[in-house]
């Protein structure tokens, strides 16, 4: 018999504003404890050095976290010129120092070369796996593993400040982009070295930054809940964003109430859509009764919606 999870069956997404010097997993566990959630997962780790948007999926929302892992990201990064480190950030050991004789125009021209589809070699100090172990495991032992360059896209790279040996940039990029590697590559192209001194993620997909929640906000609300005996459902749960927001880039279809249970049990069912959608497309799937989100399906050759990720409802409604 499967062991029952402890905690509340709460579903939704919290846009956490991750603070400095805490790992993404530590941040996740703090959120999980605050909400007394039975299940939680994040959608792409931020380094301890990095701050900013970390979407935390609770409950059934964890089934759709991959869509946020695959989403575009936006960062504000401060690069320190003239120094190269082992990790390409402020936590690493200095391995090279050079004089900075870079003009603003040279910086602008260098940034232009990184825009669009490019190849990027991931840092050795990354969580990418080699023979089952993260690359940083080997890097800490002084072992260098050959890494293949990966396809990424830099949609925009804007210089917002250039003073002395510091550069602030806003980067809008595809999944799989390592900002530390981008800054290190920029430093090499400029001939003066560079590393990341500050990194803040402002957006995942098109989630607005003003919806982010800090730990201070959570702690204040928890104290209020305890002092005034307010249920968590009334004080914390309104902070959550609906789980279907993770897949809102997908087109949507609807099912009749008669088809709902069959769909939730894994059977392809007929669907209704106002738009023409190609076979093989992943779609958000709703019940026409109450516009309830049921999950993600794939449209098959029989003009049916075949379930791929379905929501398990703790209560029928």
Curated annotation (Swiss-Prot):
Q: Name one GO biological process term.
A: tRNA pseudouridine synthesis
Described by its record, this protein's role is as follows: Responsible for synthesis of pseudouridine from uracil-55 in the psi GC loop of transfer RNAs.
Task: Name the Gene3D superfamilies for this protein.
Answer: Pseudouridine synthase (3.30.2350.10), PUA domain (2.30.130.10)
Keyword line:
Isomerase, tRNA processing
Q: Which reaction does it catalyse?
A: uridine(55) in tRNA = pseudouridine(55) in tRNA
Indicate the enzyme's highest-level EC class.
isomerase
Q: Which parts pass through the membrane?
A: none
What gene is this protein a product of?
truB
Please state the Enzyme Commission number of this protein. Answer: 5.4.99.25
Q: Which family does it belong to?
A: Belongs to the pseudouridine synthase TruB family. Type 1 subfamily.
One protein family per Pfam = TruB-C_2
- CDD domains according to UniProt: PseudoU_synth_EcTruB, PUA_TruB_bacterial
**Protein's name according to its UniProt entry:** tRNA pseudouridine synthase B
